[in-house]
Amino acid sequence: MSDTSIKQQSQLTSGDFTAAENPFELFAEWLAEADRSEPNDPNAMALATVDSDGLPDVRMVLMKGYDADGFVFYSHIASQKGRELTANPKAALLFHWKSLRRQVRIRGTVTPVSDAEADAYFATRPKQAQIGAWASKQSQPLESRFAFEQAIAKVAARYLIGEVPRPPGWSGWRITPSRVEFWHDRPFRLHDRIEFNRDTPAQPWTKTRLYP
């Protein structure tokens, strides 16, 4: 590794964010570190949506991919988050890596992934998880755990042999960010914060330091 590369890596990992030219570069570095240090699910993120009354809802989901177009997760379309994203396709995300004392906040617009993308990801899931996606009516009232187990057994019998197709009501979303903020803990609450902004995906990012 060259001296320049070592210096840039040090800047990215030390909280000196001047080396980062776009948020995806810095996010990739932080996620790689979280993958090494977090005991569970470094790709876990809080997803915030709003209902028809403007009241917020937030829950933890797993990021299943990201690139320059945004951050991807999957769920049932008829779930509470799915209904809220259909009615108001805007959302916020929060990654918090306690072991690194860092967090990343993201806001942006939401679009469904393509059927081909959803099919490809669903095919990678364990078969029991695929069966669960068919058996669950996510966010709907459930009579009992036994009723759910019966539904799982029924689906498992149907797909005892062969591949399990993706349920028509199960898919994914991509959050295309317009704002990404990185926060790094410092002693005495003198934290580091840097914010990236853009109005549209076609525009370049602007970078601003923020007071803690």
Curated annotation (Swiss-Prot):
The enzyme's E.C. designation: 1.4.3.5
Reactions catalysed: pyridoxamine 5'-phosphate + O2 + H2O = pyridoxal 5'-phosphate + H2O2 + NH4(+); pyridoxine 5'-phosphate + O2 = pyridoxal 5'-phosphate + H2O2
Keyword entries, A-Z: Flavoprotein, FMN, Oxidoreductase, Pyridoxine biosynthesis
Record-level Gene Ontology MF annotations: FMN binding; pyridoxamine phosphate oxidase activity
InterPro entries: Pyridox_Oxase, Pyridox_Oxase_CS, Pyridox_Oxase_N, Pyridoxamine_oxidase_dimer_C, Split_barrel_FMN-bd
Membrane spanning stretches: none
PROSITE patterns with a match to the protein in the record: PYRIDOX_OXIDASE (PS01064)
Cofactor: FMN
Family annotation (Gene3D superfamilies): Electron Transport, Fmn-binding Protein, Chain A (2.30.110.10)
Pathway in which the depicted protein is active: Cofactor metabolism; pyridoxal 5'-phosphate salvage; pyridoxal 5'-phosphate from pyridoxamine 5'-phosphate: step 1/1; Cofactor metabolism; pyridoxal 5'-phosphate salvage; pyridoxal 5'-phosphate from pyridoxine 5'-phosphate: step 1/1
Keyword Oxidoreductase attached: yes
GO biological process: pyridoxine biosynthetic process
A Pfam short name: PNP_phzG_C
Binding residues for FMN: R59, M60, V61, L62, M63, K64, Y74, S75, K81, Q103, Q138, S139, W183, R193
Coiled coil: none
Residue positions binding substrate: K64, Y121, R125, R189, L190, H191
Class of enzymatic activity (EC top level): oxidoreductase
Stated role: Catalyzes the oxidation of either pyridoxine 5'-phosphate (PNP) or pyridoxamine 5'-phosphate (PMP) into pyridoxal 5'-phosphate (PLP).
The family this protein is said to belong to: Belongs to the pyridoxamine 5'-phosphate oxidase family.
HAMAP family: PdxH
Binding partners and assembly: Homodimer.
Annotated protein name in UniProt: Pyridoxine/pyridoxamine 5'-phosphate oxidase
Originating species: Rhodopseudomonas palustris (strain HaA2)
